[in-house]
Amino acid sequence: MSERGTTTAPAGLDAGADARHPALRVADRLRLTTVYVLLLTATACWLAGQSHGARARFVRHNSSNVHHMEVGKWWTMFTSGLVVDGVPAWAGIAAVAVVLGLAEWRWGPARAGAVFVFGHLGATLLTEGAMWVMLTARIPGALSRARDVGISYGLVGTAGCLLALGPAPLRRFGLPALGLGLAVTWALDQQLADAGHLVALGLGALAARTPWLRGRARARARVPVSATR
């Protein structure tokens, strides 16, 4: 049988398409996560080179607290998410790479980014709104200039959504276990951020009930393993 008229790809063309380092292929697929991790790393490296006073000023000026909301500095709700606080920078950045990366791998950048931002902004607005009510009612312990920066609200919200859309064992045991751990931490420390983590977890579980995410999760589950490689 003649093979004239058929087109054969040059040997090595397909191999060349996949010749990149595996890390580069992953970064290309997880562009949102890669960009965010690079931003967090750049901010952490810059802060590491500053004095203690300069770092404290940066955190203070980028905290999304009641005072900044009242004076119109709403942009702090976004810039606060560029600072890793409360844990070593490498640990926070690694957690973002894993959790946001897994979400982007499963749902795509639009859905993963939307869930992360929903958890971050939603928990920030609700906790600061509660703080504003406490200040208005003159309840002791309320602070208008509270230190509130970090990636944790978006991180917890995304993790909660992943657990809620995961296999049955994760939904039944993983999500309640995370909620219990966060509740115990809040009961022991009584910090604003601890309450925000519980709120973010609830928001993540709520986001998992939307058709936009549930439909994507079902479609992903129906795709054969060979088709996702």
Question: Where do the PLM segments sit?
Answer:
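Hydrophobic, membrane-inserted alpha-helices
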Residues: 76, 94-101, 155-161, 176-186
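N-terminal signal-anchor transmembrane alpha helix
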Residues: 17-60
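N-terminal TM1-TM2 helical hairpin plus the immediately adjacent luminal interfacial "cap"
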Residues: 47-109
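Loop-to-transmembrane alpha-helix initiation sites
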Residues: 189-204
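Short, Lys/Arg-rich, polar N-terminal cytosolic tail immediately upstream
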Residues: 1-26
